[in-house]
Amino acid sequence: MVRRNIELCFPDLTAAEHDALVFRHFEALGMMLIEMGLGRWASDKHLESITKLTGIEHVTNALESGNGVILLSAHFTTLEIMGRVLSLNMPPFDAVFRRNRSEFMTELQRTGRERSAEFTIEKRDIKKMVRSLRKGRAVWYAPDQSYNRKGAEVIAFFGVPAMHTTATSTLARLGNATVVPFFPRRLPDSTYELILMPALQDFPSDDATADTRRYINLLEQHVRTCPEQYFWIHRKFKDLPADYPDYYADLDASK
């Protein structure tokens, strides 16, 4: 799965370079377990000593103006530790989580998010997200994984067709919210950087697909800076319409 996703997204790499990136990704997955522990149990002082936060003013300025804020992120192996760091530097916020087939994994994710966020919201509960935004709160939202329900569109990721939800545009409109993209990464010296970008201007537009493409473009740019830390273990290119390729058919057949 990991190798297939990497091959699709980085076709210009050699086979040896694919192998190296796959290996580095599994190293990042191993580090993720440690980072989850740091996010849950490390002291505030220790976390502040190993992290750098840039752009927090983009969030605080929006909140001070009375707007809700969508903290628009994505699934990186470093995300849980950075959620905790974010919580040390801004007013309490809410975090969206995805219900997993495994109840254990659902609770692991939910309780981990609760270490950072004041409240958690299941990702299908759009009404609850909108209510929170209308109250002038911030909501941490990562809508990059494959989505096959109403409101999904085929939008390329690294040039490969993928199903993406267009809900960010809807949330911003209904919640009258400012959208601030933020992405984390682990640096070569084993410290961490959390980058909060300037609020998206003219967002949402009247084209939810174009809005989503703006987000995907930003995500791709960040992935290129730390490709081993994106969550390649997820089936990013599943659930495409029938007239698109099944990128995992041979993997499924070999099970």
Tell me the role of every PLM-derived stretch.
Residues 24, 31, 65-124, 135, ...:
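Catalytic core of membrane glycerolipid acyltransferases/transacylases, capturing the structured
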Residues 1-73, 108-111, 117:
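Membrane-anchoring hydrophobic helices of lipid-metabolizing enzymes
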Residues 2-5, 82, 108-109, 125, ...:
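Hydrophobic alpha-helical segments typical of transmembrane helices
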